[in-house]
Amino acid sequence: MKVSLQQRVLFSGLLICAPTHSAELSGFAGLGASVRPIYSGSNHMAVEPLLNAGVNLHSENWGLFGLSTDGLIWGLTPDSPFSVSLLLTQDEARKEVFNYSFSGKKNRDLQGMGDLSAALMAGTDLRYQQEHWMLWLRLLTATEKQRYGGDAPGRSLIVTSGAETELWRWQSVALSVGGDISWANSGYQQRHYGVTAQQAQRTDFAVYSPSSGFQQGGLYAEVVWHLDKNLAAGLTSRAQYLFDEAGSSPLVNSRMQYTLSSLIQYTF
């Protein structure tokens, strides 16, 4: 997920406001690869590079500020089991012609739909965390309306809740499993799964206007191996199912979506 210059400037302003005499600065950087569908609902998979990096500022008076490749986070109560965070992130862009990273191949399944630009999303994250498990709820909404396919649907809104637990740990290796489910409004569904009249004229897809409803449910498993106190390697597998309106879209070739990703991360 890309981070815009606007987000970096905002984070810099927060750093200036934080009392540096009581703050701790840390960071992380990771590199890996993932195998995943080329877009939500596609039955074609692609190998893509993964880059994960960021910095965190932990202040006694202001909480936790984080800037990463996932966006911005302000954790208001980072040291308690129940935490509340404010988020600024992106709903990823989608190209009508997909270029495979490690070959000259192209996928033209969505040609004629037009490129879907990234959307800035703001929201909040609530979670309750104990030593070996956690529950969480996240709400994100687009900061502005966005035209796509000749129409301007309402602002995207998506609510996701989930749970995760650590099943097994041996020395420096841990196995965790989790699940989540998402509900999305019609604006989000139209953005990702809808087909406007203008798009239908340029493609073989029928006009489709999905309504609000459950968007997806997923299960995942993750193995993390701490090589030393600063270096860790992880492997994550995920399976998710597109529900109702999302899964019925003419853009969707497969309701079941699978992802496998690996990452080596260094913290400092």
Residue ranges of each PLM-predicted region?
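Repeated loop/turn-to-beta-strand initiation elements of outer-membrane beta-barrel proteins
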Residues: G27, E60-L64, F82, H132-L135, ...
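Predominantly the C-terminal beta-signal and adjacent terminal strand-loop region
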Residues: G41, F214, L219-F268
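Transmembrane beta-strands of outer-membrane beta-barrel pores
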Residues: A33-Y39, L57-S59, L88-R94, Q130-H132, ...
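Transmembrane beta-strands of outer-membrane beta-barrel proteins
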Residues: F28-S34, F65-S68, S85-T89, W136-L140, ...
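Short glycine/proline- and aromatic-enriched beta-strand/turn motifs that initiate or cap beta-hairpins
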Residues: A23-L67, L72, R94
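Outer-membrane pore/translocation modules
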Residues: T69-E164, W168-Q171, Y188-S211
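Residues that define the transmembrane beta-barrel architecture of outer-membrane proteins
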Residues: L25, M45-L51, L116-A122, E131, ...
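Residues on the lipid-exposed face of transmembrane beta-strands in outer-membrane beta-barrel proteins
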Residues: L31-V35, L51-L57, G71-L76, A122-Q130, ...
